[in-house]
Amino acid sequence: VYTQTPRRQVNLSAFYLKPGQEWMTTLFLRRMMADDSVDYLDVTPSYSMREINRRIGFQDHSTGMVVVPTAAACWRPAGTCRLLALRDVPAGALSPAVMSLLARHHRLGCVALVVEMEGEYHPLILAATGRKGVAGVRVLLARDRALIRAVLGPLSRHLLGRGLFYLEYDAMAAPDDIPEALFWRRSSPVQMTRAPVGEAIDLTFSEFAFIPSPKLAVALKDLPQRAKHRVLRWSATDRISAYADPVTGVALQLAEYGIV
């Protein structure tokens, strides 16, 4: 979306390295990646594949995952940002190609929204994910991480109302301006053979959109109703307590509901 010149990209999500066969991998990948006009991407490399990728030209574009509890971030003000559903986007605000991209990801089960900020419109795509049975979303497409931070309040409220308890996105370091966020260094780094333009996150049509976890589907089945009847009906005192100590408050609520 954010590249000046459209390029072909090959995702190595289906590449499997059999233990004990590492010596063959480098030669195989070098032959497979002989076309310099193609960008190569690996968003879920195993520990052994990460080092092999680096040797053949991949660069790390993240060192961990920023994880933001939506129950803690939902108190943030909207500022000048506004979230729009696809049906509410004004005609001509985004190109037909971008609107088609959003619609196709929406049909795949992703959260597809448009952010209106200072008179400009930006696509935002999130894919369902899960950690230890807790449902959340991962950012697949955003102009940059600054846009995510700017819209974090209304976005967290939107997600929490749908039973999604955290938002995560890949990054090189923990953000200084999101104190409620955790930085998970054990997540796989995003590796690419070509540096992305600017600070954009673009993992559209990756395995996160096509292959959701089977366990996650079961966990998500009744979460919206549980969130509607429990999380969104906290008393004022409960809400203040959770805000004062977000991590503890959210953890206690999740434990109470039997989610963790």
Name the predicted role of every residue range.
Residues Y2-G64, G133-S187:
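Acyl-donor binding region in acyl/amide transferases
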Residues T5-V10, H106-V115, P196:
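Short, mixed-charge, low-aromatic patches
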Residues L27-R30, I52, L102, L108-G109, ...:
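Aromatic-enriched hydrophobic runs in primary sequence
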Residues T44-R87, R143, G161-V260:
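Active-site/acyl-donor-binding loops of N-acyltransferases
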Residues R54-L140:
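Amide-forming acyltransferase catalytic core, primarily the GNAT-like/NAT-type
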Residues A97-V98, L155, A227:
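Generic structural signal of hydrophobic/aromatic residues within well-ordered alpha-helices
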